Amino acid sequence: MRSTILAFLAVWVTFSSLSFSADPPKKNSFEVKNGVNISHWLSQSGTRGERRAAYFTRADVEYIAGLGYDHIRLPIDEEQMFTEDGQKEPEAFALLHNALGWCEEFQLRVVVDLHILRTHHFNAAEKPLFTDAKAQEQFYECWRKISGELSKYSIDKVAYETMNEPVADDPEIWNVIVNRCVAVIRELEPERTILMGSNRWQSYTTVKDLRVPENDPNIIISFHYYEPFLLTHYKASWSHTRDLNVPVHYPGQLIADADMASAGNHARAGRAVFNIDVIESHFKQVIDAAQKYNLKIYCGEYGVINAAPHADKIRWYKDMTTLFERHGIGRANWDYKGGFGILRGTEPQTEMINAILGK
């Protein structure tokens, strides 16, 4: 069955790629350095109506630009943007257009990220996207309609990210689907920047498995980084770290020897040592994997939950910023107002913001 699915999808990718492979797109000037994710607005939220409209406004964009960010990553979900029968949701698209207009006004670039599909959630047990041809076509049709709405925006200001954190049983299943998706977008927008992430949550360990279209200079390879997990997801309610009841440290050994007896199931992971050199070795895996395509890389998500020990969190952010700058990696911290946010309520986390922006 797996071989049949891959063979079928491969035919589609090969066929659809012919339309642009002979005449590769010219390089545009979309460049990003330091961004922030606008989470829980058009993605991962049940809020609608006036409350949704008030969650992210022109004042937020002005504030973000004033801090010194140069872009936002804007997650959108299929269920917010489209009805179950595939019709566009006018209110959601109006909000998206508002955000893009505000970003243009305040000179912020935007990565529009199709975050969650009805047929794919990165933490769901069942993901029909990888086994159902109709689900795949629905995914491509989402992008045709998104492109139809957004193609009027400058290719130097707005980029598309195909999908957030794919989790297929086999990386080649995702490779076939994502390359077909790129081909669909290329039929409509030959020179738009497209971000592609690798299988299994866009991990730094799987970028080597990502297959990227050749001779397309407007592709960016995207990865996410949440290591060490005991720190970044400290006591996260949705994670196995929810019962972590000892401090976690950075840099150095994550859990002190004196606390090991109380660390429970986290003792083994807690013995790991993390520092800037370890993180850089992980980044180099991404850099090396991207070199064969001569493409830039982008860290679309990274961050530490607000519940983590403050001083350790700040040291981690400073090291991340040092490495991003050292290797010329664009990035967007997760997130703006959520559990990892640079705002707590309306209160700016100034020390955290300064560490992220290198101030």
Locations of the language-model features?
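Positively charged n-region of N-terminal signal peptides that target proteins for export
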Residues: 1-7
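Bacterial N-terminal signal peptides
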Residues: 7-16
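N-terminal carbohydrate-binding accessory modules
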Residues: 20-71, 86, 289, 355
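An active-site-proximal structural segment forming one wall of the substrate-binding cleft
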Residues: 52-55, 59-71, 87-116, 123-159, ...
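Glycine-rich, proline-tolerant flexible connector loops at the mouths of alpha/beta enzymes
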Residues: 76-90
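Active-site region of glycoside hydrolase catalytic domains
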Residues: 133-273, 280-304, 326-329
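Aromatic-rich peripheral "rim/lid" segments of glycoside hydrolase catalytic domains that contact
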Residues: 308-359
